[in-house]
Design a protein with these regions (language model features):
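Conserved AMP-binding/adenylate-forming core of the ANL superfamily
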Residues: 15-45, 49-58, 62-66, 83-88, ...
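Conserved AMP-binding A3 loop
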Residues: 25-27, 151-175
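AMP-binding/adenylate-forming catalytic core of the ANL superfamily
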Residues: 82, 99, 240, 345, ...
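Conserved AMP-binding/adenylation subdomain of ANL enzymes
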Residues: 174-190, 200-239, 252-254
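Gly/Ser/Thr-rich phosphate-binding loop
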Residues: 237-242, 251-310, 322
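Conserved ATP/PPi-binding loop(s) of AMP-dependent carboxylate-activating enzymes
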Residues: 316-320, 331-362, 397-399
Length: 498
Protein backbone atom coordinates (compact mmCIF):
# COMPACT_ATOMS: atom_id res chain seq x y z
CA UNK A 1 0.00 0.00 0.00
CA UNK A 2 1.18 3.51 -0.81
CA UNK A 3 0.84 6.21 1.83
CA UNK A 4 -1.54 8.36 -0.21
CA UNK A 5 -3.89 5.38 -0.60
CA UNK A 6 -4.91 6.06 3.01
CA UNK A 7 -6.99 9.06 1.93
CA UNK A 8 -9.61 6.71 0.47
CA UNK A 9 -9.91 4.28 3.39
CA UNK A 10 -12.89 6.04 4.96
CA UNK A 11 -16.45 6.40 3.71
CA UNK A 12 -16.63 9.36 1.28
CA UNK A 13 -19.19 11.25 3.36
CA UNK A 14 -17.55 10.50 6.74
CA UNK A 15 -15.56 13.28 8.41
CA UNK A 16 -11.84 12.68 7.94
CA UNK A 17 -10.33 15.87 9.37
CA UNK A 18 -11.34 18.52 11.88
CA UNK A 19 -9.15 21.62 12.06
CA UNK A 20 -10.75 24.01 14.55
CA UNK A 21 -14.00 25.15 12.85
CA UNK A 22 -13.21 23.45 9.52
CA UNK A 23 -14.37 19.93 8.67
CA UNK A 24 -13.41 17.81 5.67
CA UNK A 25 -15.10 14.60 4.58
CA UNK A 26 -12.95 11.84 3.11
CA UNK A 27 -14.18 12.92 -0.33
CA UNK A 28 -13.23 16.57 0.29
CA UNK A 29 -9.92 15.43 1.76
CA UNK A 30 -9.11 13.42 -1.38
CA UNK A 31 -10.04 16.40 -3.59
CA UNK A 32 -7.78 18.72 -1.57
CA UNK A 33 -4.87 16.28 -1.92
CA UNK A 34 -5.46 16.10 -5.68
CA UNK A 35 -5.47 19.91 -5.87
CA UNK A 36 -2.22 20.03 -3.93
CA UNK A 37 -0.63 17.39 -6.15
CA UNK A 38 -1.59 19.37 -9.26
CA UNK A 39 -0.17 22.60 -7.80
CA UNK A 40 3.09 20.90 -6.89
CA UNK A 41 3.45 19.31 -10.31
CA UNK A 42 2.77 22.65 -11.99
CA UNK A 43 5.47 24.21 -9.80
CA UNK A 44 7.97 21.65 -11.07
CA UNK A 45 7.96 18.93 -8.40
CA UNK A 46 8.88 15.55 -9.86
CA UNK A 47 9.47 12.03 -8.61
CA UNK A 48 12.42 11.85 -6.23
CA UNK A 49 12.47 15.57 -5.45
CA UNK A 50 12.66 16.55 -1.79
CA UNK A 51 9.96 18.97 -0.68
CA UNK A 52 10.21 20.63 2.72
CA UNK A 53 7.16 21.30 4.91
CA UNK A 54 7.68 24.08 7.44
CA UNK A 55 4.40 24.46 9.26
CA UNK A 56 2.53 23.95 12.48
CA UNK A 57 -0.13 21.25 12.56
CA UNK A 58 -2.95 21.96 10.13
CA UNK A 59 -5.17 20.33 7.54
CA UNK A 60 -2.89 21.91 4.93
CA UNK A 61 0.14 20.11 6.37
CA UNK A 62 -1.72 16.85 5.75
CA UNK A 63 -2.78 17.86 2.22
CA UNK A 64 0.82 18.82 1.43
CA UNK A 65 2.31 15.58 2.74
CA UNK A 66 -0.07 13.37 0.79
CA UNK A 67 0.24 15.53 -2.31
CA UNK A 68 4.02 15.19 -2.22
CA UNK A 69 3.83 11.44 -1.64
CA UNK A 70 1.40 10.94 -4.54
CA UNK A 71 3.99 12.39 -6.94
CA UNK A 72 6.70 10.00 -5.76
CA UNK A 73 8.55 12.95 -4.23
CA UNK A 74 9.89 12.88 -0.67
CA UNK A 75 8.34 14.99 2.07
CA UNK A 76 10.81 16.55 4.50
CA UNK A 77 8.91 17.87 7.54
CA UNK A 78 10.95 20.52 9.36
CA UNK A 79 10.63 21.44 13.02
CA UNK A 80 9.15 24.95 13.02
CA UNK A 81 11.13 25.81 16.16
CA UNK A 82 14.49 25.55 14.41
CA UNK A 83 16.68 28.54 13.74
CA UNK A 84 17.33 29.70 10.17
CA UNK A 85 20.76 28.09 10.30
CA UNK A 86 19.30 24.74 11.35
CA UNK A 87 16.65 24.98 8.63
CA UNK A 88 19.33 25.80 6.08
CA UNK A 89 21.35 22.75 7.17
CA UNK A 90 18.38 20.45 6.46
CA UNK A 91 17.72 22.15 3.12
CA UNK A 92 21.34 21.65 2.11
CA UNK A 93 21.62 18.11 3.46
CA UNK A 94 18.39 16.87 1.87
CA UNK A 95 18.80 18.88 -1.33
CA UNK A 96 15.42 20.53 -0.89
CA UNK A 97 14.33 22.53 -3.95
CA UNK A 98 10.77 23.31 -2.82
CA UNK A 99 9.67 24.52 0.61
CA UNK A 100 6.04 24.77 1.67
CA UNK A 101 5.51 27.43 4.35
CA UNK A 102 2.88 29.70 5.88
CA UNK A 103 5.15 32.71 5.65
CA UNK A 104 8.20 33.14 3.40
CA UNK A 105 11.48 32.49 5.20
CA UNK A 106 14.53 34.69 4.71
CA UNK A 107 17.29 32.10 4.53
CA UNK A 108 19.80 34.03 2.42
CA UNK A 109 22.35 34.64 5.18
CA UNK A 110 21.98 31.18 6.71
CA UNK A 111 22.40 29.51 3.32
CA UNK A 112 25.46 31.62 2.62
CA UNK A 113 27.04 30.63 5.95
CA UNK A 114 26.68 26.98 4.96
CA UNK A 115 27.93 27.68 1.44
CA UNK A 116 24.69 26.34 0.04
CA UNK A 117 23.81 27.65 -3.41
CA UNK A 118 20.56 25.71 -3.83
CA UNK A 119 17.71 27.73 -5.24
CA UNK A 120 14.69 26.98 -3.09
CA UNK A 121 11.22 27.78 -4.40
CA UNK A 122 8.94 28.67 -1.49
CA UNK A 123 5.28 27.71 -1.91
CA UNK A 124 2.32 28.99 0.12
CA UNK A 125 0.98 26.02 2.06
CA UNK A 126 -2.17 27.93 3.03
CA UNK A 127 -3.70 27.51 -0.44
CA UNK A 128 -2.26 24.12 -1.30
CA UNK A 129 -5.60 22.33 -1.02
CA UNK A 130 -7.48 24.83 -3.18
CA UNK A 131 -8.07 24.12 -6.84
CA UNK A 132 -5.95 26.31 -9.10
CA UNK A 133 -7.43 27.23 -12.46
CA UNK A 134 -5.34 27.19 -15.61
CA UNK A 135 -3.01 24.31 -14.72
CA UNK A 136 -3.03 20.79 -16.11
CA UNK A 137 -3.72 17.86 -13.78
CA UNK A 138 -0.65 15.93 -12.70
CA UNK A 139 -0.26 12.60 -14.49
CA UNK A 140 -1.35 9.42 -12.74
CA UNK A 141 1.77 7.85 -11.24
CA UNK A 142 0.26 4.90 -9.41
CA UNK A 143 2.05 2.31 -11.53
CA UNK A 144 5.42 4.04 -11.71
CA UNK A 145 6.65 3.33 -8.17
CA UNK A 146 5.92 0.70 -5.52
CA UNK A 147 5.69 0.74 -1.75
CA UNK A 148 9.45 0.37 -1.34
CA UNK A 149 9.86 3.85 -2.83
CA UNK A 150 11.07 6.43 -0.28
CA UNK A 151 8.29 8.63 1.08
CA UNK A 152 9.72 10.89 3.77
CA UNK A 153 12.94 12.01 5.42
CA UNK A 154 12.55 12.49 9.16
CA UNK A 155 15.40 14.46 10.71
CA UNK A 156 16.43 13.47 14.19
CA UNK A 157 16.36 16.19 16.83
CA UNK A 158 20.12 16.56 16.83
CA UNK A 159 20.44 16.11 20.60
CA UNK A 160 23.49 13.92 20.00
CA UNK A 161 25.11 16.07 17.32
CA UNK A 162 24.39 16.85 13.69
CA UNK A 163 20.84 15.81 12.71
CA UNK A 164 20.51 12.71 10.57
CA UNK A 165 17.71 12.15 8.08
CA UNK A 166 15.96 8.79 8.50
CA UNK A 167 14.51 7.74 5.13
CA UNK A 168 11.19 5.90 5.43
CA UNK A 169 9.47 4.16 2.54
CA UNK A 170 5.75 4.00 1.79
CA UNK A 171 5.83 0.40 3.02
CA UNK A 172 7.61 1.32 6.26
CA UNK A 173 4.81 3.73 7.15
CA UNK A 174 1.77 1.76 5.96
CA UNK A 175 3.11 -1.43 7.54
CA UNK A 176 3.49 0.40 10.83
CA UNK A 177 -0.14 1.54 10.68
CA UNK A 178 -1.16 -2.11 10.24
CA UNK A 179 1.04 -3.05 13.20
CA UNK A 180 -0.98 -0.70 15.40
CA UNK A 181 -4.29 -2.46 14.76
CA UNK A 182 -4.43 -3.96 18.23
CA UNK A 183 -5.01 -0.45 19.60
CA UNK A 184 -8.59 -0.99 18.48
CA UNK A 185 -9.32 2.25 16.62
CA UNK A 186 -12.61 2.06 14.70
CA UNK A 187 -14.24 4.35 12.09
CA UNK A 188 -16.43 5.97 14.76
CA UNK A 189 -13.44 7.00 16.87
CA UNK A 190 -11.92 10.47 17.02
CA UNK A 191 -8.17 10.78 17.38
CA UNK A 192 -6.54 13.98 18.62
CA UNK A 193 -3.42 15.13 16.79
CA UNK A 194 -1.74 17.64 19.09
CA UNK A 195 1.84 16.38 18.88
CA UNK A 196 3.82 18.03 16.08
CA UNK A 197 3.23 16.47 12.69
CA UNK A 198 6.88 16.88 11.77
CA UNK A 199 7.62 14.20 14.38
CA UNK A 200 7.11 10.55 13.49
CA UNK A 201 5.16 9.67 16.68
CA UNK A 202 2.58 12.38 16.16
CA UNK A 203 2.32 11.72 12.42
CA UNK A 204 2.02 7.94 12.29
CA UNK A 205 -0.09 7.42 15.41
CA UNK A 206 -2.35 10.48 15.25
CA UNK A 207 -2.76 10.86 11.47
CA UNK A 208 -1.83 7.78 9.44
CA UNK A 209 -3.28 5.17 11.80
CA UNK A 210 -6.75 6.74 12.17
CA UNK A 211 -6.91 7.33 8.40
CA UNK A 212 -5.96 3.67 7.87
CA UNK A 213 -9.11 2.60 9.75
CA UNK A 214 -11.34 5.36 8.32
CA UNK A 215 -11.60 7.27 11.60
CA UNK A 216 -11.56 11.02 12.29
CA UNK A 217 -8.42 13.11 12.92
CA UNK A 218 -8.92 16.16 15.15
CA UNK A 219 -6.07 18.62 14.54
CA UNK A 220 -4.69 21.18 16.98
CA UNK A 221 -1.86 23.42 15.84
CA UNK A 222 -0.11 23.22 19.22
CA UNK A 223 -0.65 22.11 22.78
CA UNK A 224 -2.18 24.61 25.17
CA UNK A 225 -3.97 23.09 28.17
CA UNK A 226 -7.16 25.15 27.90
CA UNK A 227 -7.74 24.61 24.17
CA UNK A 228 -6.72 20.96 24.29
CA UNK A 229 -9.10 20.15 27.14
CA UNK A 230 -11.93 22.05 25.43
CA UNK A 231 -11.29 20.20 22.17
CA UNK A 232 -11.27 16.80 23.87
CA UNK A 233 -14.59 17.65 25.50
CA UNK A 234 -16.34 19.39 22.60
CA UNK A 235 -15.19 17.03 19.82
CA UNK A 236 -15.73 13.87 21.86
CA UNK A 237 -12.13 12.77 21.40
CA UNK A 238 -11.66 9.05 22.08
CA UNK A 239 -7.96 8.43 21.42
CA UNK A 240 -4.97 10.41 22.68
CA UNK A 241 -1.36 9.93 21.61
CA UNK A 242 0.62 12.25 23.84
CA UNK A 243 3.83 12.66 25.84
CA UNK A 244 4.24 12.43 29.64
CA UNK A 245 4.30 16.20 30.18
CA UNK A 246 0.85 16.48 28.56
CA UNK A 247 -0.41 13.56 30.67
CA UNK A 248 0.74 15.43 33.77
CA UNK A 249 -0.94 18.71 32.78
CA UNK A 250 -4.21 16.99 31.89
CA UNK A 251 -4.20 15.33 35.31
CA UNK A 252 -3.80 18.70 37.01
CA UNK A 253 -6.18 20.77 34.89
CA UNK A 254 -8.86 18.56 33.30
CA UNK A 255 -11.93 17.19 35.04
CA UNK A 256 -13.30 13.69 34.77
CA UNK A 257 -16.23 15.20 32.85
CA UNK A 258 -13.83 16.78 30.33
CA UNK A 259 -12.25 13.39 29.67
CA UNK A 260 -15.34 11.19 29.74
CA UNK A 261 -15.21 10.22 26.03
CA UNK A 262 -11.54 9.17 26.13
CA UNK A 263 -11.10 5.40 25.78
CA UNK A 264 -7.39 5.20 24.96
CA UNK A 265 -4.33 7.14 26.05
CA UNK A 266 -0.92 6.22 24.65
CA UNK A 267 2.24 7.86 25.95
CA UNK A 268 5.45 7.88 23.97
CA UNK A 269 8.35 10.09 22.95
CA UNK A 270 10.11 9.65 26.28
CA UNK A 271 9.83 7.49 29.37
CA UNK A 272 6.65 7.78 31.42
CA UNK A 273 7.30 8.30 35.15
CA UNK A 274 5.19 5.89 37.19
CA UNK A 275 3.76 8.67 39.37
CA UNK A 276 2.35 10.48 36.33
CA UNK A 277 0.80 7.22 35.16
CA UNK A 278 -0.81 6.33 38.49
CA UNK A 279 -2.11 9.87 39.13
CA UNK A 280 -3.72 9.98 35.67
CA UNK A 281 -5.38 6.59 36.05
CA UNK A 282 -6.68 7.37 39.54
CA UNK A 283 -8.31 10.60 38.35
CA UNK A 284 -9.76 9.55 35.00
CA UNK A 285 -10.13 5.78 35.29
CA UNK A 286 -8.20 5.27 32.06
CA UNK A 287 -4.88 3.44 32.04
CA UNK A 288 -2.07 4.97 30.01
CA UNK A 289 -0.61 2.52 27.51
CA UNK A 290 3.08 3.26 27.24
CA UNK A 291 4.72 2.50 23.94
CA UNK A 292 8.16 2.71 22.41
CA UNK A 293 9.51 3.67 19.04
CA UNK A 294 12.07 5.61 17.06
CA UNK A 295 11.99 7.74 13.94
CA UNK A 296 14.05 4.98 12.35
CA UNK A 297 11.20 2.49 12.91
CA UNK A 298 8.31 4.60 11.56
CA UNK A 299 8.13 4.76 14.74
CA UNK A 300 6.16 2.09 16.67
CA UNK A 301 8.06 -0.97 17.93
CA UNK A 302 6.24 -1.94 21.12
CA UNK A 303 2.92 -1.01 22.70
CA UNK A 304 0.98 -2.00 25.78
CA UNK A 305 -2.31 -3.51 24.58
CA UNK A 306 -5.40 -1.71 25.91
CA UNK A 307 -6.70 -3.46 29.02
CA UNK A 308 -3.49 -5.46 29.41
CA UNK A 309 -1.01 -2.70 30.17
CA UNK A 310 1.76 -3.22 32.71
CA UNK A 311 2.91 -0.18 34.65
CA UNK A 312 6.52 0.68 33.86
CA UNK A 313 6.61 -1.49 30.75
CA UNK A 314 6.71 -0.40 27.13
CA UNK A 315 4.63 -3.48 26.33
CA UNK A 316 5.31 -6.41 24.04
CA UNK A 317 6.51 -5.94 20.49
CA UNK A 318 3.78 -5.15 17.97
CA UNK A 319 3.01 -7.80 15.31
CA UNK A 320 5.71 -8.16 12.67
CA UNK A 321 8.59 -7.09 14.92
CA UNK A 322 11.51 -9.37 15.73
CA UNK A 323 13.68 -8.30 18.63
CA UNK A 324 16.72 -9.33 20.64
CA UNK A 325 18.49 -8.10 23.76
CA UNK A 326 22.24 -8.36 23.26
CA UNK A 327 25.54 -7.72 25.01
CA UNK A 328 28.52 -5.74 23.72
CA UNK A 329 29.53 -8.72 21.56
CA UNK A 330 26.08 -8.84 19.94
CA UNK A 331 25.28 -12.11 21.72
CA UNK A 332 21.84 -12.65 23.26
CA UNK A 333 21.80 -12.10 27.03
CA UNK A 334 20.06 -14.59 29.36
CA UNK A 335 16.29 -14.05 29.69
CA UNK A 336 15.55 -11.25 32.15
CA UNK A 337 19.00 -9.67 32.02
CA UNK A 338 19.72 -6.26 30.52
CA UNK A 339 21.37 -5.48 27.22
CA UNK A 340 20.92 -3.40 24.09
CA UNK A 341 17.50 -3.68 22.46
CA UNK A 342 17.78 -4.39 18.73
CA UNK A 343 14.87 -4.86 16.33
CA UNK A 344 13.97 -5.96 12.80
CA UNK A 345 10.79 -5.57 10.73
CA UNK A 346 9.17 -4.10 7.62
CA UNK A 347 8.79 -0.76 9.42
CA UNK A 348 12.55 -0.23 9.78
CA UNK A 349 14.00 2.65 7.76
CA UNK A 350 15.79 2.32 4.46
CA UNK A 351 18.74 4.16 5.99
CA UNK A 352 20.06 7.63 6.77
CA UNK A 353 20.06 10.13 3.92
CA UNK A 354 23.52 10.30 2.30
CA UNK A 355 25.17 8.71 5.37
CA UNK A 356 26.25 5.19 4.37
CA UNK A 357 28.58 4.71 7.35
CA UNK A 358 25.96 5.81 9.89
CA UNK A 359 23.42 3.57 8.13
CA UNK A 360 25.78 0.59 8.31
CA UNK A 361 26.41 1.23 12.00
CA UNK A 362 22.71 1.59 12.88
CA UNK A 363 21.60 -1.40 10.79
CA UNK A 364 24.59 -3.67 11.28
CA UNK A 365 23.79 -7.32 10.87
CA UNK A 366 20.37 -6.40 9.47
CA UNK A 367 19.12 -5.24 12.89
CA UNK A 368 18.31 -1.70 14.01
CA UNK A 369 20.49 -1.00 17.04
CA UNK A 370 18.37 1.29 19.19
CA UNK A 371 20.98 2.35 21.74
CA UNK A 372 18.48 1.58 24.50
CA UNK A 373 19.12 -0.81 27.38
CA UNK A 374 16.18 -3.15 27.97
CA UNK A 375 15.02 -6.32 29.71
CA UNK A 376 12.05 -8.62 29.18
CA UNK A 377 9.77 -10.28 31.74
CA UNK A 378 8.37 -13.84 31.56
CA UNK A 379 5.22 -12.56 29.80
CA UNK A 380 7.18 -10.97 26.96
CA UNK A 381 6.67 -7.40 28.18
CA UNK A 382 9.70 -5.21 27.62
CA UNK A 383 11.16 -2.57 29.92
CA UNK A 384 13.54 0.21 28.92
CA UNK A 385 16.17 0.56 31.61
CA UNK A 386 17.97 3.53 30.09
CA UNK A 387 19.89 4.87 27.12
CA UNK A 388 23.30 3.29 26.60
CA UNK A 389 24.76 6.75 26.14
CA UNK A 390 23.11 8.04 29.35
CA UNK A 391 24.46 5.25 31.54
CA UNK A 392 26.80 6.48 34.27
CA UNK A 393 29.84 4.36 35.14
CA UNK A 394 31.02 5.15 38.67
CA UNK A 395 33.93 3.17 40.17
CA UNK A 396 33.17 0.44 37.65
CA UNK A 397 29.49 0.23 38.63
CA UNK A 398 26.74 0.90 36.10
CA UNK A 399 24.15 3.48 37.17
CA UNK A 400 20.99 3.85 35.10
CA UNK A 401 19.66 7.40 35.56
CA UNK A 402 16.05 6.40 34.94
CA UNK A 403 16.03 4.21 38.07
CA UNK A 404 17.15 7.17 40.18
CA UNK A 405 14.79 9.59 38.43
CA UNK A 406 11.78 7.37 39.13
CA UNK A 407 12.48 7.66 42.86
CA UNK A 408 13.12 11.41 42.73
CA UNK A 409 9.70 11.85 41.09
CA UNK A 410 8.12 10.10 44.08
CA UNK A 411 9.48 12.67 46.53
CA UNK A 412 6.81 15.26 47.46
CA UNK A 413 7.18 18.58 45.66
CA UNK A 414 9.27 17.35 42.72
CA UNK A 415 7.81 18.27 39.32
CA UNK A 416 10.63 17.27 36.96
CA UNK A 417 13.89 15.39 37.39
CA UNK A 418 16.92 14.47 35.31
CA UNK A 419 20.00 12.61 36.51
CA UNK A 420 23.07 13.21 34.36
CA UNK A 421 26.61 11.89 34.53
CA UNK A 422 29.32 14.43 35.38
CA UNK A 423 33.07 14.07 35.74
CA UNK A 424 34.37 12.88 39.10
CA UNK A 425 38.13 12.72 39.73
CA UNK A 426 37.86 9.79 42.13
CA UNK A 427 35.03 7.74 40.66
CA UNK A 428 35.36 8.61 36.98
CA UNK A 429 31.72 9.70 36.84
CA UNK A 430 29.07 10.65 39.35
CA UNK A 431 25.42 11.55 39.07
CA UNK A 432 24.07 15.08 39.22
CA UNK A 433 20.34 15.52 39.81
CA UNK A 434 18.65 18.52 38.21
CA UNK A 435 15.07 19.12 39.28
CA UNK A 436 12.21 21.60 39.32
CA UNK A 437 9.42 21.96 41.87
CA UNK A 438 5.66 22.22 41.73
CA UNK A 439 4.44 25.82 42.26
CA UNK A 440 4.74 26.82 45.92
CA UNK A 441 6.66 23.69 46.91
CA UNK A 442 9.90 23.60 48.89
CA UNK A 443 12.04 20.58 49.67
CA UNK A 444 14.94 19.62 51.91
CA UNK A 445 17.87 18.15 50.01
CA UNK A 446 18.88 16.33 53.18
CA UNK A 447 15.48 14.63 53.32
CA UNK A 448 15.60 13.86 49.61
CA UNK A 449 19.00 12.20 50.07
CA UNK A 450 17.67 10.19 53.02
CA UNK A 451 14.74 9.04 50.88
CA UNK A 452 17.07 7.94 48.09
CA UNK A 453 19.47 6.23 50.50
CA UNK A 454 16.58 4.19 51.87
CA UNK A 455 15.76 2.91 48.40
CA UNK A 456 19.04 2.78 46.46
CA UNK A 457 22.58 1.50 46.80
CA UNK A 458 24.85 4.29 48.02
CA UNK A 459 26.87 4.41 44.80
CA UNK A 460 23.68 5.35 42.90
CA UNK A 461 22.97 8.46 44.99
CA UNK A 462 23.69 11.63 42.98
CA UNK A 463 26.68 13.61 44.17
CA UNK A 464 25.01 16.95 43.46
CA UNK A 465 21.49 18.38 43.39
CA UNK A 466 20.57 21.49 41.41
CA UNK A 467 17.18 23.20 41.38
CA UNK A 468 16.09 24.85 38.12
CA UNK A 469 12.94 26.90 37.38
CA UNK A 470 12.07 24.26 34.78
CA UNK A 471 13.93 21.64 32.79
CA UNK A 472 14.33 22.38 29.08
CA UNK A 473 12.60 19.99 26.73
CA UNK A 474 12.79 19.04 23.11
CA UNK A 475 9.82 19.63 20.80
CA UNK A 476 8.60 16.10 21.50
CA UNK A 477 8.59 16.52 25.27
CA UNK A 478 11.86 14.83 26.13
CA UNK A 479 13.93 16.47 28.85
CA UNK A 480 16.92 17.92 27.00
CA UNK A 481 19.73 16.47 29.10
CA UNK A 482 22.43 17.64 26.75
CA UNK A 483 21.22 21.24 27.03
CA UNK A 484 21.11 20.97 30.84
CA UNK A 485 24.65 19.59 30.97
CA UNK A 486 25.96 22.22 28.57
CA UNK A 487 24.47 25.05 30.66
CA UNK A 488 25.78 23.46 33.86
CA UNK A 489 29.32 23.14 32.49
CA UNK A 490 29.27 26.73 31.26
CA UNK A 491 28.07 27.99 34.64
CA UNK A 492 30.66 25.85 36.40
CA UNK A 493 33.42 27.28 34.23
CA UNK A 494 32.27 30.74 35.29
CA UNK A 495 32.09 29.67 38.92
CA UNK A 496 28.32 30.19 39.06
CA UNK A 497 27.03 26.63 39.29
CA UNK A 498 25.15 26.18 42.54
Amino acid sequence: MLVHDLIRRGKPDAIALVDHDRRFTYQEFAEAVTNCRDRLFAAGVRMGDRVGIFSRNSAEFIFAYFGIASLGALAVPINFQLSNREIAFIIKDAGIRFLMTYEPLNLVDAMAQLRCDLRVQQLDIRVCGNKKEGIDPAPALADTFDDHHPCVIIYTSGTTGTPKGAVLSHRNLTYNTWQMEWMGCQPEHRVLCVLPMYHCFGWTCSVLYPLYVGARVVVLDQFTPKETIATIRDEGVTDLYIVPSICSLLTKLASAEDMKTVRLVVSGGTTLPMKIQTDFTEKFGVSICEGYGLSESSPVVTMNPPGKAKTGSIGPAVPGIRWRIVDANNDDVPHGETGEFIVKGENIMLGYWNLPEATHEALRGGWLHTGDVARVDPDGYLYIVDRLKDMIISMGENIYPREVEELVYQFPGIAEAAVIGIEDKLRGQAGACFYSLHPGATISIRELKKFLQANLALYKIPREFHELPHLPRTATGKIAKRAILKEFMEQKALGKAK
